[in-house]
Design a protein with these regions (language model features):
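Class I S-adenosyl-L-methionine
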Residues: 1-108, 112, 116
């Protein structure tokens, strides 16, 4: 299973309970290093895949590899994972796999910055 999770605009108070639970249930968490730092208090005992800016494709490929192996994987994005987040890229990469090899995927929406500002 791979879950693509929006963690909100940065503060833990802006993360939805669903996003929090999805991260806690994961055994592997992948994300941009800055976002990993924002949730480091949730990552004890987890395999962490952190990469820098401009390494989104590599990060998603590594996360998908872990999910294919049977791991419960969370890919975190700031804001909402579907709005300038990682959901589109993860889905695009999954479509390149043979259908029988694709792990289940779930998109966990988060609070986008535009909604937080309202």
């Amino acid at each position: 299973m791979i879950k693509v999770i929006g963690i909100g605009p940065g503060g833990k108070e802006d993360m939805t309970p669903r996003a929090l639970n999805a991260i806690l249930e994961a055994d592997t968490v992948a994300g941009y290093n800055t976002y990993i730092k924002l949730i480091k208090h949730l990552l004890d005992g987890k395999n962490v895949i952190g990469t820098g800016m401009m390494q989104e494709v590599d990060r998603c490929k590594m996360a998908i590899e872990e999910a294919v192996k049977g791991h419960n994987v969370a890919v975190v994005s700031s804001g909402d994972s579907g709005v300038y987040g990682m959901a589109g890229l993860v889905l695009e990469l999954l479509l390149k796999l043979p259908k029988e090899e694709r792990p289940q995927v779930q998109i966990v929406a988060g609070l986008s910055a535009v909604n937080a500002a309202a």
